[in-house]
């Protein structure tokens, strides 16, 4: 078959396959055109779920007579004129495809009048070449679009339309979403001659909340927490439901970027992460949020239906949204779940060969840290030292040949040498080869002295303590993309001011003003922690203890920091041990109590022998 240019109607129908998914898609495109035209009132009439009639009437600026035919042509628009405009889009529409695509799969009539005209004009396209006919009509200033018999000429598409009730439900949802972002526009929705929705234009905050309640329900309004978060050219405002409200309203999620309705994965992930220790995995947060960003920093031309965007600084936007939502939840006093057990995906098998020590696992993005149990500041200062539990069971105890100990003494420099753990020879370079992971928390090692069991969480704590010891030059502060605003009491603020030199040595940058404390930088090992909980607890610890040294503070951080792995796998254990061997050679030569335990395999083998 020879290459040829497609006829206009066929080309438009192909484009309609992306733009016009169902009647609700038509309503969305046409209402957005009305909003771009500056309309303050929009009336939507629907018949038979949109299959028979979709009529959109507005009081916008209208379309001039000599532009009506062009309005129904492909790639014709008044919203952008150059590539620079495309890179900073502020209108809802910009491609110039909607009207041409819709007219190719329906009988579309466009009637419009501008304020400068004394009469209105009507245009419609017909035939294979989509020729446009223009004739006089009666109409006030504004535009009316009628879409009759949607998909009449594409039976396959019409066959896949759902019931009238289902299609209208989708249309109703589109109108709800638009009404939530354009409070200044009056909107009415009629179905089969019956008025279904009517939203009056509102201006003040009280009226906005009434419209919010009318759309989202009084249940959401009663649990709504208002958010107003600003950083540079980023702005986040709207409402989020408290955890108890979110559990009952998990399907209520509305998000907008520069006034455009979105279903963006990055935004949803940031919001879900903010609720992670409040809701767990079984519930979804409920929210109505509006993100304002410099149009040059976001690309909206990445999705056929414009449901997704691409941020040029995605990590900055993610952290900004996360910090904003976390702050309002903390200020409201929302309770944290006591403990969250998250199921981890099955890990792929990794080869047993150890990579050379020297690779720093902090240099690669770390998995999300397991949430720590919530605690008040006062209780956290008096928290008991971590208790490392060994697995119970007769077979396990026989294998280890040691009595089970329920507690480990506090970490101290002396504990590295004063213990009854097996001492390795002075020339030992490693713990040995990782054979397997036992019960997701221990590594079974094979070394020169035989088999040994190593507690991975204990090794991780020792490593973190070594990484947090500042030395003579201090730790390098790592600036946060979004400074964290902390809520501190007087004792914590006083401790921060008193220990400013120690905090600088630890790489922690705090800025105090009259009302707030901003955390601007932390050392690299703390970047993955929940800083809004950890730093206030640290200041509380300093308030309760005088003359704390950098070593003691590093030890405290190592104990209080959440583990980066709730369930360890083979490759993670290898990476951890390589770092421990590089940074903590003393642990290899003389492991402290609770870190390493020899396994007497001979006894187990003898028990299996038969005479």
Swiss-Prot record:
SMART domains the record matches: DNA_mis_repair, MutL_C
NCBIfam families named in the record: mutl, PRK00095.1-1
Compositionally biased region (Low complexity): 363-380
UniProt keyword list: DNA damage, DNA repair
Annotated protein name in UniProt: DNA mismatch repair protein MutL
Species name: Erwinia tasmaniensis (strain DSM 17950 / CFBP 7177 / CIP 109463 / NCPPB 4357 / Et1/99)
Function in brief: This protein is involved in the repair of mismatches in DNA. It is required for dam-dependent methyl-directed DNA mismatch repair. May act as a 'molecular matchmaker', a protein that promotes the formation of a stable complex between two or more DNA-binding proteins in an ATP-dependent manner without itself being part of a final effector complex.
Record family assignment: Belongs to the DNA mismatch repair MutL/HexB family.
Region (Disordered): 353-387
Gene Ontology molecular function, alphabetical: ATP binding; ATP hydrolysis activity; ATP-dependent DNA damage sensor activity; mismatched DNA binding
Pfam families: DNA_mis_repair, HATPase_c_3, MutL_C
HAMAP family membership: DNA_mis_repair (MF_00149)
């Amino acid at each position: 078959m020879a290459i040829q240019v497609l006829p206009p109607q066929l080309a438009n129908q192909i484009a309609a396959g992306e733009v016009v998914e169902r009647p609700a898609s038509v309503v969305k495109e046409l209402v957005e055109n009305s909003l771009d035209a500056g309309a303050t009132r929009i009336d939507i009439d629907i018949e038979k779920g949109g299959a028979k009639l979709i009529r959109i009437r507005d009081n916008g600026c209208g379309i001039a007579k000599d532009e009506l035919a062009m309005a129904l042509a492909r790639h014709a628009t008044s919203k952008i004129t150059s590539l620079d405009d495309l890179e900073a889009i502020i209108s809802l529409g910009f491609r110039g495809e909607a009207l041409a695509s819709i007219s190719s799969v329906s009988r579309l009539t466009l009637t419009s009048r501008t304020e400068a005209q004394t009469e209105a004009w009507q245009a419609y396209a017909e035939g294979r070449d989509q020729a446009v006919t223009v004739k006089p009509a009666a109409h006030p200033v504004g535009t009316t679009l009628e879409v009759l018999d949607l998909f009449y000429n594409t039976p396959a598409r019409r066959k896949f339309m759902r019931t009238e009730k289902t299609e209208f439900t989708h249309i109703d949802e589109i109108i709800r979403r638009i009404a939530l972002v354009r409070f200044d526009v009056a909107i009415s929705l009629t179905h089969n001659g019956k008025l279904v929705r009517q939203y009056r234009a509102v201006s003040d905050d009280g009226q906005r909340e009434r419209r919010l309640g009318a759309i989202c329900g009084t249940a959401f309004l009663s649990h709504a927490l208002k958010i107003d978060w600003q950083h540079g050219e980023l702005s986040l405002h709207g409402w989020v439901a408290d955890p108890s409200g979110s559990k009952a309203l998990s399907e209520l999620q509305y998000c907008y970027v520069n006034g455009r309705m979105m279903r963006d994965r990055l935004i949803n992930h940031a919001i879900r992460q903010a609720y992670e220790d409040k809701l767990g995995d079984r519930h979804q947060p409920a929210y109505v949020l509006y993100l304002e960003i410099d149009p040059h920093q976001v690309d909206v031309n990445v999705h056929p239906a414009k449901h997704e965007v691409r941020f040029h600084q995605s990590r900055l936007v993610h952290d900004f949204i996360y910090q904003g939502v976390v702050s309002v939840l903390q200020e409201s006093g929302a309770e944290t779940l006591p403990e969250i057990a998250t199921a981890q995906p099955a890990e792929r098998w990794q080869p047993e060969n150890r990579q050379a020590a020297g690779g720093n696992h902090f240099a690669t993005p770390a998995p999300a840290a397991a949430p720590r149990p919530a605690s008040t500041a006062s209780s956290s200062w008096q928290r008991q030292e971590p208790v490392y539990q060994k697995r119970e069971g007769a077979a396990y105890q026989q294998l280890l040949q040691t009595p089970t100990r329920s507690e480990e003494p506090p970490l101290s420099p002396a504990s590295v040498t004063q213990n009854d753990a097996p001492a390795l020879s002075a020339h030992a370079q490693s713990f040995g080869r990782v054979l397997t992971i036992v019960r997701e928390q221990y590594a079974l090692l094979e070394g020169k002295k035989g088999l040994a069991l190593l507690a991975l969480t204990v090794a991780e704590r020792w490593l973190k303590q070594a990484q947090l010891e500042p030395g003579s030059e201090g730790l390098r502060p790592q600036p946060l993309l979004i400074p964290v605003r902390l809520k501190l009491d007087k004792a914590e603020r006083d401790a921060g001011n008193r220990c400013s030199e120690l905090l600088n040595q630890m790489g922690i940058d705090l800025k105090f003003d009259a009302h707030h404390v901003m955390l601007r930088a932390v050392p690299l090992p703390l970047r993955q922690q929940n800083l809004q909980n950890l730093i206030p607890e640290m200041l509380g610890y300093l308030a309760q203890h005088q003359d704390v040294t950098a070593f003691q503070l590093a030890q405290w951080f190592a104990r209080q920091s959440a583990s980066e792995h709730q369930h360890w796998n083979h490759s993670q254990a290898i990476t951890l041990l390589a770092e421990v061997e590089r940074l903590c050679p003393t642990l290899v030569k003389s492991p402290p109590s609770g870190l390493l335990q020899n396994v007497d395999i001979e006894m187990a083998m003898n028990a299996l022998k038969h005479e």
